[in-house]
Every structure is written in structure tokens, then in C-alpha cells.
Amino acid sequence: MVRELRLVVTADDYDEALRFYRDVLGLPERAAFSSPGGRVTILEAGRATLEITDPPHAEYIDEVEVGRRVAGHIRVAFEVDDSTATTRELEEAGATVVAEPTKTPWNSLNARLEAPAGLQLTLFTELE
């Protein structure tokens, strides 16, 4: 039985990635370790799910959120309280906005960003 999903990201600029995800996005630090010449930090990211999609549906999601196909095989999605405000905060902290928040057919407000460590992010807020 799986107990935890852990996404491991190799960041060329470790300090910038840590600042962005821990200090700006607000992911709490669970643990940090070092090895000769290397470091790792484990950040809490709330409840985790694994969303598996086929290529046509991934293309559909990109069309809805961005207007064109932009995601690779992996995209990280964070549910946030206010996707519009969080998009602005992350942009000010160095992320590139790929698509501004847009209302989706599944009733959420989704934004797409390129973030440190080469991750493409979706920020989403479920609408009532």
C-alpha cells in the first residue's frame, strides 16, 4: 500500500527553487539533509493525488487553460485559496505566466506558469 506520493525535482539553482516553493508559495519544510556537495529539502504540499491522463485529454486541458498545447509529460497542479492573487505573487517572485487565470468547464479558476526547476505549474481554485 502506498503511503505517500513524493515528487522529486532536481533543480540546477537549488537556492532559487527552495526560495520560490518554500518562501513564496508557502510549502512548509518537513526535513532537510545534505550529502558531500549536495542538499535536499522535503516540502509539504498538502494532500497528493496522481492524475493520469491520455494525450487527447491532456491536449484538451491545455486548450482550456492556455489556448494551445504547452505541457510536457508532467505538470504540477496546486490547489490554492486564490489563483489570481497567487499567480501575481509567483510572477513577482520569478515565475513566467503562460496563461492568466481562466474559468474552466469543470468550475475552477486555473492559471498556468513556468516556475523554477523547470516545472510547469497549474494553480487552481475550486469555484462554488
Question: Each PLM stretch: what is its role?
Answer:
Residues 17-22, 90, 118:
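Conserved active-site tyrosine of GNAT-family acetyltransferases
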